[in-house]
Amino acid sequence: MIIVTGGAGFIGSNIVKSLNDLGRKDILVVDNLKDGTKFINLVDLDIADYCDKEDFIAQIIAGDDFGDIDAVFHEGACSATTEWDGKYIMHNNYEYSKELLHYCLDREIPFFYASSAATYGDKTEFVEERQFEGPLNVYGYSKFLFDQYVREILPNASSPVCGFKYFNVYGPREQHKGSMSSVAFHLNNQILKGENPKLFAGSEHFLRDFVYVGDVAAVNIWAWQNKISGIFNCGTGHAESFKAVAEAVIKHHGKGAIETIPFPDHLKSRYQEYTQADLTKLRAAGCNLKFKSVAEGVAEYMAWLNRK
């Protein structure tokens, strides 16, 4: 069996899809379906069982036997960079992850988890080392601290433990994320409503490493199949502008022109203006995946979003 936490969420459900594509259906999805709309991410996927995230962690802490587990993909977390309830974030993202990690270590179950480029904060070098990290929000801190925890245990781990610092992920199955959905998702909705796609003032200078979720899932599968340990960046290695995203959305629809709106005050000083994954470590580990460009990935995403 394979366990995917956050399996009804954005990246988790795409990992489930990739596992299905490999013929694996013996999957336990762990999630919180209080937001019932997330069920739609699982409708076209095949899984063996579902468990609520609180019931699951209680079983983990109790040391319950789930049978033979080939891998755990731990994608579940509160991923809202705008959430400032630190007690909630640290319990949900940090403490939960530690419990699950030790369960896997004790049983030599390969453990793959979601870190984040938010651990870098406003740094301009994106290398998977402590000196380049400095999160700007409590979400980023929760991910940073777990990375630090993993770094301490990695030398003595007898089974794979692998974290991925996800950069700006976009693609299918993110619709439930609301304001945290990708720019491509929001621009598509604006055009569907008959509006022009809107970007913040200065967006031509904001460069991000936009990575397609299908590629993110593929990197996770690669790490599992190759028994990889370590903490790695997961991005394309190329920064592109928000303008490039808007142009790709406009190209799909064949209409619309970019409108500029004022930059929100509440995001100032907490906004990453530039991200670009350094893939040196990932490539050295043997990952040769060709990541989609914004033009390629957004075109595929728009075709999926607007399918009839």
UniProtKB/Swiss-Prot annotation:
Keywords: Carbohydrate metabolism, Isomerase, NADP. GO terms for biological process: ADP-L-glycero-beta-D-manno-heptose biosynthetic process; carbohydrate metabolic process. The active site is at Y139, K177. One of its GO terms (molecular function) is NADP binding. SUPFAM superfamilies: NAD(P)-binding Rossmann-fold domains. Substrate binds at N168, S179, H186, F200, A201, G202, S203, R208, Y271. It catalyses: ADP-D-glycero-beta-D-manno-heptose = ADP-L-glycero-beta-D-manno-heptose. Its EC number is 5.1.3.20. Its cofactor is NADP(+). Binds 1 NADP(+) per subunit. Pathway: Nucleotide-sugar biosynthesis; ADP-L-glycero-beta-D-manno-heptose biosynthesis; ADP-L-glycero-beta-D-manno-heptose from D-glycero-beta-D-manno-heptose 7-phosphate: step 4/4. The keyword Transcription does not apply. The keyword Membrane does not apply. Pfam families: Epimerase. NADP(+) binds at residues 10-11, 31-32, 38, 53, 75-79, 92, 143, 169, 177. Catalyzes the interconversion between ADP-D-glycero-beta-D-manno-heptose and ADP-L-glycero-beta-D-manno-heptose via an epimerization at carbon 6 of the heptose. NCBIfam families: heptose_epim (TIGR02197), PRK11150.1 (NF008360). Homopentamer. Contains a large N-terminal NADP-binding domain, and a smaller C-terminal substrate-binding domain. Belongs to the NAD(P)-dependent epimerase/dehydratase family. HldD subfamily. This is ADP-L-glycero-D-manno-heptose-6-epimerase.
